[in-house]
Amino acid sequence: RSFSYNEVGCAIKGNIIRIAKNKYKFFKSREVEGKIKVLTVKRDACGDFYVYLACETPGVKIEPRLGKSIGFDFGLKGKMLVAPNKEDDVVAPSFFKKKQKAIAKASREFSTKRPHSNNRRRAQLSLARLYRKVTNQRKAYHWQLARELCQKYAVICFEDLNMERMHRGYGKKVSDYGFSEFLRILEYVAPQFGTRVVKVDRFYPSSQLCCECSYQNPRVKDLSVREWVCPSCKTHHDRDRNAAQNILDEGLRILSA
């Protein structure tokens, strides 16, 4: 459902694109910067065509900047990202959840249509458009959030979690937040702002360590333990906030090593 051309086989002038010997009108979402190296045309499940351009631009190196640092723990209880301080939390819209009833209805209508009929094709198209809307909304939010975080922080620390394992355990919630896609976008955006993204090893016991005295509490391995009191220094911890603080501390240690 896609094909590519190198710089010889394509050209763009205004809103006209030449692919091989054919010319097509297209909607230009933004101006093309640099020299086109590869052009890819993709067709989505709705039957619409999209043009993706890989361009060569003069390299401008942005040095890492100084500024505020933050550590985030991935949340599943109504918050996408949990920070050491409540005011820095990120509450993400659940785009799939909002469209779930409409998607379920469209799925039922699709399943009742006779195979290979026009009605079935129309029902399939309606369902595909709903899924595409959810995907586009989530992606737009991820880009916006990545830019906001990179403008605000010079260092952003995350735990390098096994997303496939999380998906098996939490399913729709992990898919709806799109953690993996967000991290990919964040790592792409960060260098443009001089922001550094640091990943802490997934086996680092961020939830079990007391962020005040570094006491390790093995009882916190149980995910049902949401709050706990450190037996050593008696500090009361919220599981996710304590983990976020430990992720920040470990990320800064990695950065300075």
What kind of region is each of these model predictions?
Residues R1-K42:
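Acidic carboxylate diad motif detector
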Residues V32-T40, A45-A257:
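Positively charged, helix-rich recognition surfaces that bind polyanionic ligands
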